[in-house]
UniProtKB/Swiss-Prot annotation:
Pfam families: GrpE (PF01025). The keyword Cytoplasm applies. This is Protein GrpE. Keywords: Chaperone, Cytoplasm, Stress response. Homodimer. CDD domains: GrpE. The gene is grpE. Its main location: cytoplasm. It is found in: Cytoplasm. The lineage of its organism: Bacteria, Pseudomonadati, Campylobacterota, Epsilonproteobacteria, Campylobacterales.
């Protein structure tokens, strides 16, 4: 064989070898990329599952808190209502004592005693729940008093409260009902 042919064959074998090496490298890169894609897809799927679980937990918590909020609103006055049962019981006892065979003076005394006890129970219950009476001593305050009439009074200055006609009440710092008062001219 001639030198030229040998060189040609050698060159062709070198090219084929280089192509085989490139093909092997490409196959290895392809396998490496496929593994990487598979790993990334797996990580993505895992992240999606974690997100869906976290979102479901969030939604469940949101529903639970909403339910608890409505229950708190529905039963907010439960303690107050239970505390009102004592004055109610006192009134019922006073009425039952009126049915007993006693003379009128004794009956009147028992009813008066029952009403006083009931009033005391109401006041105690109100204080327990931060319900206080609006003060009506001194100057008229339009924020907590409602002037229903003006009267002449030698003992009071103009604008001072002369008489409380109906008590007013405050729950903590919120006015439940203003006091109905008469004020001096």
């Amino acid at each position: 064989m001639s030198e030229e042919k040998k060189d040609e064959i050698l060159e062709q074998e070198t090219v084929e070898t280089k192509e085989e090496i490139k093909t092997e490298e490409a196959e290895q890169k392809t396998e490496s990329l496929e593994e990487k894609v598979a790993r990334l897809e797996s990580e993505l799927k895992e992240s999606e599952e974690k997100f869906l679980r976290a979102y479901a937990d969030f939604e469940n918590m949101k529903k639970r808190l909403e339910k608890e909020k409505y229950q708190a609103i529905d039963y907010a006055s439960e303690k107050f209502a239970k505390d009102l049962l004592t004055p109610l019981d006192t009134l019922e006892m006073a009425l039952n004592s009126a049915k007993a065979d006693v003379d009128a003076n004794e009956l009147l005394e028992k009813l008066k005693e029952g009403i006083e006890l009931t009033l005391k129970n109401f006041i105690t219950t109100f204080e327990k729940h931060n319900i206080t009476k609006v003060e009506t001593d001194g100057e008229f305050d339009p924020n907590v008093h409602n002037a229903v009439m003006q009267v002449d009074s030698a003992e009071h200055n103009s604008g001072q409260i002369v008489q409380e006609l109906q008590k007013g009440y405050v729950l903590k710092d919120r006015l439940l009902r203003p006091s109905m008062v008469s004020i001096a001219n």
